[in-house]
């Protein structure tokens, strides 16, 4: 049984599949959560955003289509709880106003963490810098 939760965003998730700075730390953190029965949660948006990033990398010739397709299949089978709740819309909207954000994509990730009162992990330095002061549950890896 899962005893605790953490929330993640697409930048964190994609580092499990794409070799980038801090990918090793992200993989280590993910394994630690799974081994310790931590439930990893994210808004359903994460699947769309991660798939879109991979598609863009294929389009730009950075990734092979077959490799990207395999990554998407692996994402689909991850031990990741996808969250959709009506409350997310209102929370994300309010967080967007606080952060003066032009879009709400990142705010939906923050809203999941706020709704479930759990730590939020991102690999997006810009998001971390803009949100950490207002939302101390935000962590960067």
Task: Say what each PLM segment does.
Residues 1-5, 98, 110-141:
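Acidic, PIN/NYN-like endoribonuclease modules and their adjacent C-terminal/linker elements
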Residues 12-13, 46, 87-88, 108-109, ...:
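Alpha-helix capping/helix-boundary segments
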Residues 12-13, 49-54, 71-75, 91-92, ...:
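A general alpha-helix detector
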């Amino acid at each position: 049984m899962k005893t605790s939760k953490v929330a993640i965003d697409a930048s964190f998730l994609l580092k499990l599949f794409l070799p980038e700075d801090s990918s090793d730390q992200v993989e280590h953190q993910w394994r630690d959560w799974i081994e310790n029965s931590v439930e990893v949660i994210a808004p359903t948006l994460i699947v769309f955003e991660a798939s879109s990033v991979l598609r863009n990398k294929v389009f730009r010739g950075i990734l092979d289509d077959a490799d990207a397709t395999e990554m998407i299949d692996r994402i689909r089978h991850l031990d990741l709880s996808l969250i959709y709740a009506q409350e997310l819309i209102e929370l994300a909207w309010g967080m967007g106003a606080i952060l003066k954000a032009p879009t709400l994509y990142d705010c939906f990730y923050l809203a999941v963490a706020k709704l479930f009162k759990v730590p939020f992990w991102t690999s997006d330095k810009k998001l971390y810098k803009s949100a950490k002061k207002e939302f101390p549950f935000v962590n960067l890896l």
